């Protein structure tokens, strides 16, 4: 399936790109956002991150006509360190698209999809060691239930965890789906959606990685530089929203002229998240849960 970048125009416009600026695509994926950034650059430069060597290989071909780019195979939690190694200490904009690419979802070796029978893997970085198979076959029932509840908001977390322990070993996605079908019979939506989300987050440590990346991104931004972040699930969106809020407020002493105090680090550009249009939803059903939040560095 061809990968379609979600909220493409809105997220790129939100960066307020300067032709000679330095920009970062923290989630290269299919290269759609990188392509649009490069189209707007003159003497500027793009640094694009992805921990997936396959994604970088595809993007290398797609973006071969542009010389002002650098690909970095790394988890975006190391965005600051990797850029510093290249002598880059400040940038003018950073975009994060936190969704899986269609290539990853449809890649049978990844095991992200609960619609076909794949190996239980779920690693975004194939060089990483922890897999979903290891989790479901080695974690204790309580730990499994905690993960399903915290990362998937799964109502039947304890029941599903117990069934997994009793059914071990599990090797494929549909073996896990058989369990969720029984545990979540009659519930709205696909029975395995929340469990698969929780396992993917645990395998890739997605929330820890995002927290570290957000703090690094704020340090990297020039004054006037922007963060453009697309999320696809509530935990990530809450984290981004909270980060923006925390860094756009300051506790001023009472009865003091706040004009004499420095501004908070961030100014929120999108008071409410930008959502996909009806037209985009018609053309790309995977965009349905997407939310875009934009903020600008001001101090």
From Swiss-Prot:
Query: What reactions does this protein catalyze?
Result: cytidine(1402) in 16S rRNA + S-adenosyl-L-methionine = N(4)-methylcytidine(1402) in 16S rRNA + S-adenosyl-L-homocysteine + H(+)
Binding positions (S-adenosyl-L-methionine): 31-33, 50, 76, 97, 104
Per its record, what are the GO molecular function terms? rRNA (cytosine-N4-)-methyltransferase activity
Please list the coiled coil stretches. Answer: none
Q: Does the keyword S-adenosyl-L-methionine apply?
A: yes
Kindly state one GO CC term assigned in the UniProt record. cytoplasm
- Tell me the keywords, alphabetical order: Cytoplasm, Methyltransferase, rRNA processing, S-adenosyl-L-methionine, Transferase
Q: Which InterPro entries match?
A: RsmH, SAM-dep_MeTrfase_MraW_recog, SAM-dependent_MTases_sf
**Mind listing the GO biological process terms from this record?**
rRNA base methylation
Where does this one sit in the cell?
Answer: Cytoplasm
Report the function annotation for this chain.
Specifically methylates the N4 position of cytidine in position 1402 (C1402) of 16S rRNA.
Q: What is the protein's name according to its record?
A: Ribosomal RNA small subunit methyltransferase H 1
Organism classification: Bacteria, Bacillati, Mycoplasmatota, Mollicutes, Acholeplasmatales
Q: Which gene encodes it?
A: rsmH1
